[in-house]
Amino acid sequence: MTGDAVTAFFEDLGSRGYDPLLRSVSATVRFDLVSGKTTERWLLTIQKGDLSVSHRNARADAVIRLSRDLFERVASGETTLLPAMLRGEVVLEGDYKLMIMIRRLLRTRLTVRRREAAAGYARRQQ
């Protein structure tokens, strides 16, 4: 990802449209990204697999709260949410099952990043 990893992540997520892994899910997840005294909010709406993202504060079935810096590292594929949760750097409120769904979406980006890195490595070896 280039530029702001957080914005790029949510724009990419919103542009995916339909995710077959989430075809049975209808829920909302709000990300509260904290930076100093400022909280940036992103709302992910999943409607039977259809994904949409908005940059607003609204009630949600689950809220994931973490620092913006940490989410930048997650969005760029440098780290994942689970270790950060175990360290107490991520707070989850609401439906914990949705966390598993979100991890799938984040893992998809991490997998793409690893494939891109592997492809770049393979090209350099030729």
Describe each model-derived feature in a short phrase:
Residues 1-126:
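Feature captures hydrophobic
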